[in-house]
Amino acid sequence: MLRTTRRTLMQGASLVGAGLFAAGRGWALNRLEPIGDTLAEEYPYRDWEDLYRNEFTWDYVGKAAHCINCLGNCAFDIYVKDGIVIREEQLAKYPQISPDIPDANPRGCQKGAIHSTSMYEADRLRYPMKRVGARGEGKWQRISWDQATEEIADKIIDIYEKYGPGKLMTHTGSGNMSMMRMAAPYRFASLVGGVQLDIFTDVGDLNTGAHLAYGNALESFTSDAWFGADYIMFLLFNPVATRIPDAHFLWEAKWNGARVVSVAPDYNPSSIHSDLWMPIKQGADPFLAMSMVNVIIEGKLYNEAFMKEQTDLPILVRSDNGMLLREADLEEGGSDQVFYHWDSRTGAAVKVKGSMGSEEKTLVLGDVDPALEGSFEVGGIPVTTVFEKVRAEAAKYPPEETAAITGIGPGVVRAEAETFARAKKALLMTGFNIGRYSNGIYTSWALTLMLALTGHGGRTGGLDTSWIAWNQPALLELAFFDFKKLPRLEAGGLGEFVRGGMMEHSRQHYDNDKLKARTGFDLDELQEMIDESIDAGWMPYYGDMKGLISIADNKFRRNKNAEAYRERILEEVEELFVDINVRMDSTAQWADYLLPAAAHYEAWDLRSIAFHRFVNVFSRPVPPIGEAKSDWEIMEILTRKIQERAIARGITGYEDGDVTRDFATIHDDYTMDGTLMTDHDVVSWLVENGPEFAGATLEEGVERGFFVMGEDAGPTQKLRPSEPYHAFLQQTEGKEPYKTMTGRITFFVDHPRFVRLGATVPTARHHAGRDASNYPLNFFSPHTRWGIHSNWRSNKFMLRLQRGEPNIYISPQLAAAKGIADGAQVRVFNELSFFFAQAKFYPSLPPDTIMMEHGWEPHQFPNWRPMNVCMATLLQPLELVGGWGHLNFSLWHWNANQLAHESSVDIEPA
């Protein structure tokens, strides 16, 4: 029996007291007072339990959320005592928009609930620092803000003096997704003309197939719209792990009668709760989608009215050369963006309304009945329809033929396709991993075809891409300097691939012939197509840089071929490397200067996100730790120094194309002549000028903790106060054209590169994977539950909820064959490099695959060698095209993703 003596009790009490002080919680004992008249008042502490009771008292409560690249955006109450955040709690006061729909509460997850511990951890940056050793050596000197910004300002001016504009990268990563934190560095980049990569594609987050079909990848559904669906399918999406605050809508939909299907290579946390798990082979998703298209078309389960009005399926294609029939083919001086239907009623070709070249911007067909099938002749030119082309391609993928590729039986595919086609409201949901596969564009394009064939759009469902770009013009005007001057906007995946020298490592890893057989192109062809895209001006790439200001971007962790990439970038930015960051991450370790940024609870800010209509307020519950400053104030100080030094050196500005980079007035321009000096100034200005706030005041938002966005927040339609937001209602109900070349959902692209790669219509292609190289195991890295990218990955509480160190997931069968025990250290390797990790048994994973959740910092691995050292990568050449209707470079809409799941490895005991 356990016995407690006075001695052990006193020893334990001593340890508890020491622990409180060591944890910065000494204030819990500061309330002890001398005993006075014991009859007049109670003792301050009647018993030992009062120590714990007073631990949970506070001075005041502030408001905040967490503004890194997380789609939760959850309002929290922040409890402060003696100037220290002692804990946070979910606010859970969001209003219910309709009695028929569950509310959004409580919103939150384990990452947000421990941020008050993370902000005080040892990796937190507190003071400006200057490197005094070699890069990466870890030798730093604490300096003042004045010294840091003056030296940085002079080095920026030196770069412009020596090389002219265009050699300074001022890249803001996905760690800054709130309004103030985003506007500050983007406005700075706009003024200096810095290079800013697309933050979707540099990490592989862009759903290019959605843009290809709809002309807009950032039009989707709020999560409360999921509740009304009667059919939901997840692909490359694990919402229980990665959409924690919103997942309840999915299971409430299930309880409300919806069928929920999980398509995943592993029996993941979302598969567990689904009605059906379809255990697809990794990377085979486009083959599954095309086999379902096959069933829908062959069974005539399609909705002809929707197809005729909303899609390009009835548009005419020339049979002689395989190109769309254009007005320019039939009329001298005709447009190449006006197209034709075949009107079944009149037996003649009729010009399509709503295209980019049409003067009639409507989808209304009127008396025209477009033919979906058949062959015709127009002006002596033989033609057929897009639908005929699509049907011929889909015929190649019956479920019986694709079963060996997907691992899913034909009976299951047929039954599921029929159930999907009959659904009243169907949602196909993809996560951000779809952009990290070379065949992700094929997957998404085929999914949009499934939806269009069956009439699922607007209120009847559609493709959920996890993102809505709300109408927030004031934010964009602030960030992009009223669009008078812009940063050098660069294609994200392309920029990282070329600048990081990744082709060299791809050539080491892939077998060219095998790669061609898998993807439709080899590395020589890929290089040729990359060069063509840059030389033709389709995709902007600005070449080597001389300086880098990195803001909230852990680029040395996230990029593939990690160590070689880091060496290449450090060699390039020889003049200057500044890292503006909250913590000492794997990128900050290599900088010349470190500027400490305020954390989530230390600055005024606003945050909106796609899945809900609420803008959360950050009321700066505590001042920044040490000498950290808000992002706005950092750029205010830096522009002030640039202006001072430019004037002192007799420099006014630099001609840069059509604009002048006015260094002698850059601080005045940045602050609107002194109007916006602080983060609070910025937040006040945004609320006053943003139509999404519908006239509400900042004080009202602070009191509540959030704003409810008004009708004007809707990007393509009104955000109705009592209805969820559904994608493309303006098209399905308002009959406005889509932002595509034909004005319709697009399933035929006759761009020369699409023709070259045999992809003029939706089809299926393999990703590279193990069969494109010489290593036996597929290797993929989904998002983790225990962090947002690398944020919180090293937090002690998050580590306690898992193995506590980097681990790979391995099937017991593979482990047995390799002589690996659960929990053992393993060596993962290929010809590029190797890393060590712990093995964790995962029975649902196929024996030809290992999985590792992303986001681990290099310093958490033995020898600081991370998983990315073994990752070769590619670009998808279709995503690099331009000069075709809506397929032109567009920030956050159309350019090539950095890919993550294309390489292979082997494994052995360490």
UniProtKB/Swiss-Prot annotation:
It comes from the Bacteria. It is found in: Periplasm. Residues 1-28 form the signal peptide. It catalyses: 2 Fe(III)-[cytochrome c2] + dimethyl sulfide + H2O = 2 Fe(II)-[cytochrome c2] + dimethyl sulfoxide + 2 H(+). Predicted to be exported by the Tat system. The position of the signal peptide cleavage has been experimentally proven. Its EC number is 1.8.2.4. Keywords: 4Fe-4S, Iron, Iron-sulfur, Metal-binding, Molybdenum, Oxidoreductase, Periplasm, Signal. Binds 1 [4Fe-4S] cluster. Binds 1 molybdenum-bis(molybdopterin guanine dinucleotide) (Mo-bis-MGD) cofactor per subunit. Residues 59-123 form the 4Fe-4S Mo/W bis-MGD-type domain. Allows photoautotrophic growth on dimethyl sulfide (DMS) as the sole electron donor. This is Dimethylsulfide dehydrogenase subunit alpha.
